[in-house]
Amino acid sequence: MKKEDLRIVYMGTPDFAVEALRQLVEGGYNVVGVITMPDKPAGRGHKIQYSPVKQYALEQNLPLLQPEKLKDEAFVQALREWKADLQIVVAFRMLPEVVWNMPRLGTFNLHASLLPQYRGAAPINWAVINGDTETGITTFFLQHEIDTGKVIQQVRVPIADTDNVEVVHDKLMILGGKLVLETVDAILNDTVKPIAQEDMAVVGELRPAPKIFKETCRIDWNQPVKKIYDFIRGLSPYPAAWTELHFPDKTSVVVKIYQTEKCLQ
């Protein structure tokens, strides 16, 4: 089968997901449909804002679906009508089996870590927060448990001591687009040899990457300097580490900190 004949459905929402879609389209792959989150009001005026993936899909005149519920019968039927051979997921939602099990060649996900490390919603943040000097990206086939499917390919990426989460995000975004294309080509050429995550060598214990909430971002000044430094850059520029300044009149103000320099070890 030629790449032009492979029917691909792409699922994603944020900027991180646009790059792989762009490389697929510009590479001449047959993207027959795009699925993204429903539009949401944003800002003070609560104006409807399109997701970055939707904006790109509209620019390229790609068919688009924005389901509220992924098990909705109308959505599932519309998805079936696209007759996808392969589905690709990048920074989207957890899919029900009726969706990920639909294409004959399966559904694969691009995850921003070296699985099985950092399974979860915020792998880039936690890799930087934990002071890692290396992270990476992984493509893997979806199965029932989140981020546990068989690994297809991985690429390692260094993290510099001065990198914040935005810098690492952008590195992984560009390389992730290339890895998605390489994974599609491997599937096309039937050269994929998936590896079960439990069979992969892991240095140290497995670290999770849970969703980050506001309280997660509060700085603990009792931590060592290096940990505070890594914590701040692992949350910069978004959602941003924060602390409280207390004044003699017993008032206080919340301050977000985006950048620091280490003066002590």
Describe each PLM feature range.
Residues 18, 22-26, 76-80, 97, ...:
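Amphipathic, non-transmembrane alpha-helical secondary structure
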